[in-house]
């Protein structure tokens, strides 16, 4: 699935940068088209392996009033109505990615009204995608988990610049100069057109 993901994403969710969408999908469903996640109650003992099996399970969960997420982007069942999804279409990879793009783009456009910095707005949008709130996704660790899927490492801790007595430790005179640090967060920078991210 991962080998096909870039092509599907470019066709079905072109307004979300592939790096962002890939990190999101890896965390949400591990790129499993038929993934079903139970939010409350006992989790599925095994995941469905066919579209028919996934549809049958989803219909049973809805019948029982179970709160669950489905498909590549783990779209919550409570959002299916306004996204035009059902127990069959939610497991179509293209339709599911379109829905994920719709949710994320909506969150991002609203986050931009609160955050002038586009990367901060992006993180707030990820929080919104998970919780419907710009802050709870930070508190529950979701945002950091998605960032980790993007391969972004936490930078080394630095001593406070306010303490003038602190001096950098000299390891060796022959030590090569370190490379400049990359920007925090995503290494790609979005532009405001439709939640698209571009490389520096």
Q: Which positions does each model-derived feature cover?
A:
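A mature extracytoplasmic/lumenal domain signature
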Residues: 25, 74-79
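Conserved hydrophobic/aromatic packing and binding residues within compact polymer-binding modules
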Residues: 24-25, 129
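A short gly/proline-enriched turn/hairpin at secondary-structure junctions
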Residues: 35-40
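Non-catalytic cell-wall polysaccharide-engagement segments
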Residues: 2-19, 31-32, 48-69, 73, ...
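Eukaryotic N-terminal accessory cofactor-binding modules
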Residues: 44-45
């Amino acid at each position: 699935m991962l080998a096909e993901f870039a092509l599907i994403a470019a066709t079905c969710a072109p307004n979300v940068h592939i790096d962002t969408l890939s990190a999101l999908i890896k965390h949400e469903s591990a790129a499993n088209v038929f993934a079903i996640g139970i939010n409350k109650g006992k989790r599925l003992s095994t995941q469905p392996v066919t579209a028919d099996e996934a549809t049958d399970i989803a219909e049973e969960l809805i019948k029982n009033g179970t709160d669950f997420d489905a498909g590549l982007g783990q779209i919550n069942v409570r959002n299916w109505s306004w996204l035009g999804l059902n127990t069959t279409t939610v497991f179509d990879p293209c339709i599911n990615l379109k829905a994920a793009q719709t949710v994320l783009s909506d969150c991002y456009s609203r986050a931009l009204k609160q955050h002038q910095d586009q990367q901060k707005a992006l993180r707030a949008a990820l929080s919104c995608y998970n919780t419907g709130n710009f802050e709870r996704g930070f508190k529950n660790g979701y945002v950091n988990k998605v960032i980790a899927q993007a391969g972004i490492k936490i930078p080394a801790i630095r001593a406070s610049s306010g303490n003038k007595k602190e001096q950098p430790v000299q390891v060796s005179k022959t030590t090569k100069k370190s490379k400049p640090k990359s920007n925090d967060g995503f290494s790609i920078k979005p532009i405001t057109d439709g939640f698209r991210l571009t490389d520096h």
